[in-house]
Every structure is written in structure tokens, then in C-alpha cells.
Design a protein with these regions (language model features):
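HhH-family (HhH-GPD) DNA N-glycosylase catalytic core used in base-excision repair
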Residues: 1-248
Length: 248
């Protein structure tokens, strides 16, 4: 429960992300799952309505909690709700994400919005590959839940790490181009899937294992892409080809 809420708000400046997550968890209390199960908008929204994260407002968080509540009531956990729409035979997790977000947004959200707005903030929490979205935050959540090592929690057992798609942030986009892991220029599901496919050639069983390293090369400002002289400190110096971009 905490992982999903954290991933849902993982956009924007790191300090702002951490602050928003802390504020939401403070409202949810020491037992977040129990809070979600007993969540009542009329009773609890006074603590949530003041919360703002970028364009997300309190009512969007109320809607998110209603969706999570439905998952718990219908399936017992987010994992069971997710795998109900999964096809283990699918080559990657894309079809399962499509079903997951579609079913999630079928939740009755009248208590959050009254009449559902066309661009309701809750839709941002549940993007779909069919819309072209890279589904970065959902893929980040799945990485945390499915992979098991010193970085990720690995508390889900029904999904294979081999089927995960890399969370496509700005650092992965840049390095994916530089390392020729993708020929796409425009970020989206196709780029995320192609980068993952390239990484799968290195580790078919766990292609997303490289996400943390790729992301942090960029976060540590070690990548020389875009600098006049490059960077002598860049660990990828000599293997990247930033100018080779072929298709949209």
C-alpha cells in the first residue's frame, strides 16, 4: 500500500516528492492498509483535501484511496487485483498494466469528484500502454514489488522479473539513446519496451536489474551527454553514441 502511494507521487523534484509522500502517510497513520480498508471520504477527507502535489489535488488522492480500497475489498491485495488481469504467457507486463489501469478506473469515484472530470487527476495514477504512456510510475512500483535484491523488495511472487518493463525517466531516456538501446526519439511505451528488449539481451531473466545503475549515472551528473567536452569521469565514456537516433 505504501509502495503504491509512493510510486504514484514519484514525479517532480525529489524533495517535493518525499514531502508529499510523508504528508499522505501521516494522514494514513501507522497501519496504511487498515486505513484504506476503512476509508470514508466524508470522514477522512478533511485531512486529505489540503494536500497538493504539482497538479494533483486532495480530491485526486481521495479518488486514489477509493480505487485502492476497491482492490483490497474485491481481491484482498493489490497483487491479486493485478494478476486477475494478467496473462502469464504474455512476453511482457504491458497487457497486464492495460487491464489493471482499465479496471482501476472503472471504480465509482462519485464520493471524490461528484461528476467525474474529463481530466481527473486520478487518471494520471493509472496510465495505459495503449495510450502511448511509458507508465513509468507503475513500472517503478512493479520493479519494487517483483524484483528481489538489495535494492528492490520482491514481495510479489506471481509475476516474473523477466516480464518487467524499465521505468522510463529522463536519465534512462538519455542513456538509452547514448548507448543505442533504443532508436526512438519520443519517450513512451515503445521506447521503454525497446530499451528493455535491449537489456534483455544482457539478462533475459531480469532485464530491469540495470535500471538503478542507468538512472544513477544520470542522477550523479556523471553522464557527459550534452557537454561540449563530454565528461572524462563518465563510466560509459567510449561506448555511447548520442548522435545516432533513427526514428520517432
Amino acid at each position: 500500500m505504501v509502495g503504491f502511494c509512493a510510486a504514484a507521487l514519484a514525479f517532480g523534484r525529489v524533495a517535493s516528492v518525499l514531502q508529499s509522500i510523508e504528508l499522505l502517510l501521516a494522514v494514513m497513520g501507522p497501519r496504511p492498509a487498515a486505513f484504506v480498508r476503512s476509508f470514508e471520504p466524508a470522514r477522512h477527507r478533511t485531512g486529505i483535501d489540503p494536500l497538493v502535489h504539482r497538479w494533483i489535488r486532495g480530491r485526486d488522492l481521495v479518488a486514489l484511496l477509493l480505487v485502492l480500497q476497491r482492490m483490497l475489498r474485491e481481491s484482498g491485495s493489490i497483487e491479486r487485483f493485478f494478476i486477475a488481469g494478467d496473462d502469464p504467457g504474455a512476453s511482457d507486463i504491458g497487457p497486464a498494466l492495460e487491464a489493471f489501469s482499465t479496471r482501476a478506473l472503472q471504480t465509482d469515484l462519485t464520493a471524490a469528484y461528484g461528476r467525474m472530470p474529463k481530466r481527473a487527476g486520478v487518471c494520471y495514477f493509472f496510465p495505459r500502454p495503449s495510450g502511448g504512456s511509458a507508465c513509468k510510475r507503475l513500472n517503478l512500483f512493479l520493479r519494487w514489488m517483483v524484483r528481489s535484491d538489495a535494492i528492490d523488495l520482491g514481495v510479489w511472487t506471481a509475476v516474473s522479473p523477466a516480464r518487467l518493463i524499465i521505468p522510463l525517466d529522463t536519465h534512462v531516456i538519455r542513456l538509452g539513446r547514448c548507448l543505442r538501446l533504443t532508436r526512438y526519439i519520443s519517450p513512451g511505451w515503445k521506447m521503454a519496451a525497446e530499451i528493455t528488449g535491449s537489456l534483455r539481451a544482457l539478462d533475459h531473466a531480469d532485464p530491469v536489474r540495470y535500471d538503478f545503475s542507468l538512472c544513477h549515472v544520470g542522477m550523479m551528473n556523471a553522464c557527459g551527454f550534452g557537454r561540449a567536452q563530454g565528461s572524462r569521469q563518465c563510466p560509459l565514456r567510449g561506448v555511447c553514441r548520442p548522435k545516432e537516433r533513427v526514428r520517432n
